[in-house]
């Protein structure tokens, strides 16, 4: 009985398998194949059992039945090939090889089975060769469908990947067999595979035997690629994919050179732009593989074709590719090793280039002068030898032409060509200065440059400045006398009149570059002149002379900062600038805030330049920072007769400029040096310790946190700049006391500048404070101060500012308390007094600051804080908007608009459908800030989410047109930009509104503001073109 039960259990699965096979083969159902494969993978059946169940189907007299049987077996093998044993693979391959001779209906399924077996790790040695021989012999690949041809290429690819040595054993027969398979292929999907196979044949050193030309012919027949992908191509194959794949084949071996180069020359000389580009790019790629031997016979023809394209083409792309090809050709010839008796192909090639180009450099009309120069420079840039050969021949000619031509624009053209050759010289190093090709021309070059610098033409002066910079960058070309003259010219150009600003800027930039290389020359010849100019400027400002004198003074400040590019020069310019401030502080000048701000800007630029050199940076910090603090402290002291400047130094704008200098001079300090500085500056503010300040005999104590004057309290802005720029790991002395004093000042004084400075300082330090008990104590104090301040009529504004900055400090670092503080901020949106400010506060929370809480100042700023803030708070803002009274809704809209406007667009797009209605409502808000913020948010969305925006086109058109008449110029401009962006929506959606929009946009064409008119013209033009052919 038990034996009978076991027999039934064995028979039952086979019966189920036969049923599935029958359903697939005879019932034409596809599902059973996956079921059989799943059962084989789970161990329900073996592959042998599947073959047995298919027995009658595989032997059936009807080809379609045999094909279905083979198809089922192949589909199972494609999913289960990893489970096969070596013995099973052998039997299956013998079976499939035999069936390659079967009816043409059966062959595609057989090929699928062989593809599965080509991926099996159990494939015994020798069978890969056997399979490929059978395919090459029995299968007429060209008669197969695309998918079946793709299968053949896949089999070859799999075997080349796993059985390389076996296939190489076939020798050239494998290459010949593959040529037969590839011949006549047209489908781009298959060609990509075929090109990779050919590339592997060559790169992996398979034997090509006598079939090199045949292999070239079977691939080059596709050159140049003219494939255009169909619309909505599901395969994603682009023309560029095929071009690059074919190019990799054609440029993979020098053995193709004798066949390929004539083809490239023919295509370059054709009239088809794409063929020219493809051929030149392919030639460029070939030069990396070829040598002189391959190029020798084709050089005259290649040069003639390239020259013609550069001289005659109307396409900048063809010109650029032609020049790149010439560069590569010259580099290839330069790299080849010459035998003693070999012909110097590089020399003769360069001589041909010179012969065909040099006479164009001398033509009076200078018609082909630029194309000739470009060709010469493309070749010269390829190697040191080419550069030396061409430069030594061309430079004398160009120098002669410069003197022959008297017009400034012609001289400018020639000098620009000379500049091109000078730049090329910088690529190559020469151990011996006398070997430099430019050494014999240096006197003529310097003379020519100085002529250009004194020419009335601004454009020629600009080229002269650039040429001087390049000359100076090459050692040994500028003598001491040349340098003195050069510095004199740069000094003169720095003080040119207003209409020569471009020359002034270029002169300043050149001075900075050359001062790095020749600090001694600039120290001797320029700094004394600038010091004298600065002293004259002091007296000019004191006499309140005309704007010309003042502008010279400002230019002098710019020049001092521009040349501060070398440590030795910084040690001279920094004292000059600081002394200039000190002179003003002594009351010797009638000074305006703009003057002090200008000096501070120069100091900041010097500090930025010093950041690259730690030693120079520390010198700047230890020299400038104490001096600036001393000046500010002196200015804050009560005096019977305070100077005008002392009052100026305490103005908001000037303190902000001083703070920027101090911050810039601190951010790059090492922790060790920063620790030295912080032990002096914090006690200055907490204890009035002025001992480290220069000239520290002050008439009164400095106590900004006690009962000091309002002027002293304002200097907390400078403390903020310093401590909020320190590295996070620098310990701040008396931190607990400092934080309490800052908190006290943030809500304890009526001066907004002082209280905001203290608030920012508190927030900056809070952000950097490591987690722990001390941080929690500071937070408790801050929250208590905020709540107490909000409850008091006299300090509500200061308390709100504190809430805002503390919230930002915590949002940036993902602190849990930030959620509670943000909720508190949202609650204030309904406050009659603070609601509008609370809405604007969301802009601060989402924006990057420039003074505190910056990454440059070492603040703890998490990368995705905006995304997190959006996710955590926008739902509450939306909910609050819906629940708020009508008069409060604008505040919620403003807050929401600020958040969305500063959110990365990829984060906003998925949420757009739910938020768009609110954004549209925000456009109706009377607040111009809300309107502008919302328009700024919507404009990129019109470009990036046209399908969603199309659903609201009626509302968008109406609201944008209304806002194009807003009283705010910024809103009008933004609305017109959105009208322009609307044209990116589907044309069919926009056409019903075309005439309405064109009429409405006629009004802003007459706007009184030029920028509004400009946007109106642009937008109206795009709407006019809607629906026209080619739009």
From Swiss-Prot:
Report the subcellular localization. Answer: Nucleus; Cytoplasm, Cytoskeleton, Spindle
Which InterPro entries does the entry link to?
ARM-like, ARM-type_fold, MMS19, MMS19_C, MMS19_N
Q: Name one GO molecular function term.
A: nuclear estrogen receptor binding
Give the free-text PTM comment from the record: Ubiquitinated; undergoes 'Lys-48'-linked polyubiquitination.
Q: Which residues carry this modification: Phosphoserine?
A: 1028
Per UniProt, the keywords (alphabetical) are: Acetylation, Activator, Chromosome partition, Cytoplasm, Cytoskeleton, DNA damage, DNA repair, Nucleus, Phosphoprotein, Repeat, Transcription, Transcription regulation, Ubl conjugation
Gene inactivation phenotype reads: Embryonically lethality before the implantation stage.
According to its UniProt entry, one GO biological process term is: protein maturation
As given in the record, the signal peptide range reads: none
Might you report a single GO cellular component term? Answer: nucleus
Which Pfam families does its entry note?
MMS19_C, MMS19_N
Provide the primary localization: nucleus
Q: Does the keyword Acetylation apply?
A: yes
Q: Which residues form a coiled coil?
A: none
Q: Where is it made, tissue-wise?
A: Ubiquitously expressed with higher expression in testis.
Biological role? Key component of the cytosolic iron-sulfur protein assembly (CIA) complex, a multiprotein complex that mediates the incorporation of iron-sulfur cluster into apoproteins specifically involved in DNA metabolism and genomic integrity. In the CIA complex, MMS19 acts as an adapter between early-acting CIA components and a subset of cellular target Fe/S proteins such as ERCC2/XPD, FANCJ and RTEL1, thereby playing a key role in nucleotide excision repair (NER), homologous recombination-mediated double-strand break DNA repair, DNA replication and RNA polymerase II (POL II) transcription.
Q: Which family does it belong to?
A: Belongs to the MET18/MMS19 family.
Name of this protein: MMS19 nucleotide excision repair protein homolog
């Amino acid at each position: 009985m038990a034996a009978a039960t076991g027999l039934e259990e064995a028979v039952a699965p086979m019966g189920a398998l036969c049923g599935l096979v029958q359903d697939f083969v005879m019932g034409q159902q596809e599902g059973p194949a996956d079921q059989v494969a799943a059962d084989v993978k789970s161990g329900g059946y073996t592959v042998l059992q599947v073959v047995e169940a298919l027995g009658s189907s595989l032997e059936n007299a009807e080809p379609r039945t045999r094909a279905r049987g083979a198809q089922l077996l192949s589909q199972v093998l494609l999913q289960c090939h990893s489970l096969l044993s070596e013995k099973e693979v052998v039997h299956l391959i013998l079976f499939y090889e035999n069936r390659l001779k079967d009816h043409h209906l059966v062959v595609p399924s057989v090929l699928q089975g062989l593809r599965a077996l080509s991926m099996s790790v159990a494939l015994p040695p020798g069978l890969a060769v056997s399979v490929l021989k059978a395919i090459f012999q029995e299968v007429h690949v060209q008669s197969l469908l695309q998918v079946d041809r793709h299968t053949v290429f896949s089999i070859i690819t799999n075997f080349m990947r796993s059985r390389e040595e076996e296939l190489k054993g076939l020798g050239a027969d494998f290459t010949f067999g593959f040529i037969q398979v590839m011949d006549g292929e047209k489908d781009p999907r298959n060609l990509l595979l075929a090109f990779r196979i050919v590339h592997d044949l060559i790169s992996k050193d398979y034997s090509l035997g006598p079939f090199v030309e045949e292999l070239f012919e079977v691939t080059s027949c596709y050159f140049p690629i003219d494939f255009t992908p169909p619309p909505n191509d599901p395969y994603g194959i682009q023309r560029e994919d095929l071009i690059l794949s074919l190019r990799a084949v054609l440029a993979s071996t020098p053995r193709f050179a004798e066949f390929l180069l004539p083809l490239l020359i023919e295509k370059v000389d054709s009239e088809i732009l794409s063929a020219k580009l493809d051929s030149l790019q392919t030639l460029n790629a070939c030069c990396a593989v070829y040598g002189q031997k391959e190029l020798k016979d084709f050089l005259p023809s290649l040069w003639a074709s390239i020259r013609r394209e550069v001289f005659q083409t109307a396409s900048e792309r063809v010109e650029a590719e032609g020049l790149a090809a010439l560069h590569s050709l010259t580099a290839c010839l330069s790299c080849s090793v010459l035998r003693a008796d070999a012909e110097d192909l590089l020399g003769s090639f360069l001589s041909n280039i010179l012969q065909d180009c040099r006479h164009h450099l001398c033509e009076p009309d200078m018609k082909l002068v630029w194309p000739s120069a470009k060709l010469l420079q493309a070749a010269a840039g390829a190697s040191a030898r080419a550069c030396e050969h061409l430069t030594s021949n061309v430079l004398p000619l160009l120098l002669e032409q410069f003197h022959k031509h008297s017009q400034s624009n012609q001289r400018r053209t020639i000098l620009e060509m000379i500049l091109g050759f000078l730049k090329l010289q910088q690529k190559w190093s020469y151990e011996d200065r006398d070997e430099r090709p430019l050494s014999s021309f240096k006197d003529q070059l310097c003379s020519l440059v100085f002529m250009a610098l004194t020419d009335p033409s601004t454009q020629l002066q600009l080229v002269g400045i650039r040429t001087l910079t390049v000359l100076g960058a090459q050692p040994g070309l500028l003598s001491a006398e040349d340098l003195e003259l050069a510095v004199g010219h740069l000094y003169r150009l720095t003080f040119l009149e207003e209409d020569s600003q471009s020359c002034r800027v270029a002169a300043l930039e050149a001075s900075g570059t050359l001062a790095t290389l020749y600090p001694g020359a600039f120290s001797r010849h320029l700094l004394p002149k600038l010091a004298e100019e600065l002293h004259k400027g002091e007296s000019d400002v004191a006499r309140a002379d005309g704007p010309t004198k003042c502008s010279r003074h400002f230019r002098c400040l710019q020049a001092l900062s521009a040349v501060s590019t070398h440590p030795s020069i910084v040690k001279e310019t920094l004292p000059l600038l600081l002394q200039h401030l000190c002179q003003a502080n002594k009351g010797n000048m009638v000074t305006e805030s703009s003057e002090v701000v200008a000096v501070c800007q120069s100091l900041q630029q010097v500090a930025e330049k010093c950041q690259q050199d730690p030693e120079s940076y520390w010198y700047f910090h230890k020299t400038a920072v104490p001096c600036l603090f001393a000046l500010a402290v002196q200015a804050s002291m009560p005096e019977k007769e305070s100077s005008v400047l002392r009052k100026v130094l305490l103005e908001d704008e000037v303190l902000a400029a001083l703070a920027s200098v101090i911050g810039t001079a601190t951010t790059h300090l090492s922790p060790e040096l920063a620790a030295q500085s912080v032990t002096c500056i914090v006690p200055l503010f907490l204890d009035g310790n002025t001992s480290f300040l220069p000239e520290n005999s002050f008439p009164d104590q400095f106590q900004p946190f006690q009962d000091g004057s309002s002027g002293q309290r304002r200097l907390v802005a400078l403390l903020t700049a310093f401590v909020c720029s320190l590295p996070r790991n620098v310990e701040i002395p008396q931190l607990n006391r400092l934080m309490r004093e800052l908190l006290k000042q943030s809500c304890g004084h009526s001066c907004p500048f002082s209280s905001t400075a203290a608030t920012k300082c508190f927030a900056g330090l809070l952000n950097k404070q490591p987690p722990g008990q001390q941080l929690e104590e500071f937070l408790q104090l801050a929250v208590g101060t905020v709540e107490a301040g909000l409850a008091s009529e006299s300090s509500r504004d200061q308390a709100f500012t504190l809430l805002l900055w503390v919230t930002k400090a915590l949002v940036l670092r993902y602190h849990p308390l930030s959620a509670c503080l943000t909720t508190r901020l949202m609650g204030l949106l309904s406050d009659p007094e603070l609601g509008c400010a609370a809405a604007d506060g969301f802009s601060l929370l989402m924006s990057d600051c420039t003074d505190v809480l910056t990454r440059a100042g070492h603040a703890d700023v998490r990368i995705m804080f905006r995304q997190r803030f959006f996710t955590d708070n926008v739902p509450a803002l939306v909910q609050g908007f819906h629940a708020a009274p009508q008069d409060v809704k604008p505040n919620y809209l403003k807050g929401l608009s600020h958040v969305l406007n500063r959110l990365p667009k990829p984060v906003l797009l998925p949420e757009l459908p739910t938020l768009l209605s609110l954004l549209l409502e925000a456009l109706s808000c009377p607040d111009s800030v809300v309107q502008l913020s919302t328009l700024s948010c919507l404009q990129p969305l019109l470009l990036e989410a046209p399908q969603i925006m199309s659903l609201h086109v009626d509302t968008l058109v109406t609201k944008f047109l209304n806002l194009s008449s807003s009283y705010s110029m910024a809103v009008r401009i933004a609305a017109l930009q959105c009208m322009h962006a609307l044209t990116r929506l589907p044309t069919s959606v926009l056409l019903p509104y075309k005439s309405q929009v064109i009429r409405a946009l006629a009004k802003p064409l007459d706007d009184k503001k030029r920028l509004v008119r400009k946007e109106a013209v642009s937008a109206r033009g795009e709407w006019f073109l809607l629906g026209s052919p080619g739009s």
